[in-house]
């Protein structure tokens, strides 16, 4: 599974459902983000993200699949899978989510995490945002503990027309890799990605 980075604020929320008991070997708490030039791999600067940590809420990286497994296991009765939202209404302090199968749920809080061009966001904002290709591609994958890469922290390489970030996702120091690059796709090729 690909990686995910969780801020101190998101960990604070997850700890309310006992994320603090999540296995330590399946997550990682990097201390810094190191910024490098992609041209010569020289370090530009760093940001000590551990300065923002609290005792029980630390900036955390892990595999998405491990986070999903945790949520499914501990919240299986509250998480709805294979449901498509058709309507979101808010009245006073309650939120009513209606699904395409005409079932509904009421809640106090709603977290929408369905991507940049989110159907949920469109329903709340009453818009229909569509993706617009801007001649860039994102590539992601996993790397197993290479010796030439700093496995302790987040490494962000910056350059013209190409950036990539590498960060550990567990105590085995498996690394998540994400690259953003300029790349022009034909209209026909774009249909495969939208």
Where are each of the predicted segments found?
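Conserved N-terminal helical subregion
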Residues: 7-125, 129-142, 184-194
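Short, conserved charged micro-motifs
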Residues: 149-150
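Glycine-rich FAD pyrophosphate-binding loop
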Residues: 1
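Active-site substrate-recognition segment that forms the wall
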Residues: 153-188
